[in-house]
């Protein structure tokens, strides 16, 4: 995907920002969010562990509440949870010349609208793919979660093309 050849759309106001597939919802036993843990290679795992180390304690004014199962490759904030997964596969949508992209504080993101009206964001032009999903209930804050995460992504995941 050539990020700069794609349309850019700024996401503000009430658009939904959640990933239907990645965020499995809440467990009835402990009300914790769950997320599928990626299985990247050793190099990407090392980058993701560094990202986990530098992630903010708050995103969109929500305290960190990591999803189950616990992993250095996933993180969460709030309830319903904003979910981050590091080391995900390259989304096939990156091959689409009509794909939408956004930029938040120097980090490019692929924007994918889901069937339920939610969105999935995946970093572009980084050595590892980082995916962020924001629940529909938090859509009113626009790109605030991506802005909050940008510094950590820039610090831990170098620019370049993921293998």
Annotate each language-model stretch with its function.
Residues 2-14:
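Bacterial N-terminal signal peptides that target proteins for export
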Residues 21-25:
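C-terminal motif of bacterial Sec signal peptides marking the signal peptidase cleavage site
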Residues 26-30:
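Bacterial signal peptide processing site
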Residues 35-57:
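Post-signal peptide N-terminal segment of mature Sec-exported envelope proteins
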Residues 43, 79-83, 125-129:
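Extracytoplasmic
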Residues 53-61, 154-158:
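Sec-exported extracytoplasmic/periplasmic mature domains
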Residues 59-114:
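Short, solvent-exposed recognition patches
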Residues 91, 95-163:
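Extracytosolic low-complexity repeat regions of secreted or lipid-anchored proteins
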């Amino acid at each position: 995907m050539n990020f700069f050849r794609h349309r850019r759309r700024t996401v503000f106001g009430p658009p939904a920002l959640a990933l239907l597939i990645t965020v499995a919802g809440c467990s009835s036993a402990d009300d914790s969010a769950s997320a599928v843990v990626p299985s990247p290679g050793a190099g990407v795992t090392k980058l993701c562990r560094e990202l986990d180390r530098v992630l903010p304690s708050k995103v969109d004014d929500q305290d960190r509440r990591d999803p189950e199962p616990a992993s250095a490759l996933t993180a969460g904030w709030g309830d319903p949870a904003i979910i981050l997964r590091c080391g995900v596969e390259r989304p096939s949508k990156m091959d689409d010349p009509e794909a939408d992209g956004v930029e938040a504080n120097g980090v490019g993101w692929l924007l994918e609208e889901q069937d339920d009206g939610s969105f999935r964001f995946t970093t572009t032009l980084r050595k590892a793919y980082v995916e962020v999903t924001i629940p529909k209930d938090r859509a009113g804050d626009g790109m605030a979660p991506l802005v909050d995460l940008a510094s950590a992504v820039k610090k831990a995941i170098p620019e370049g093309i993921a293998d």
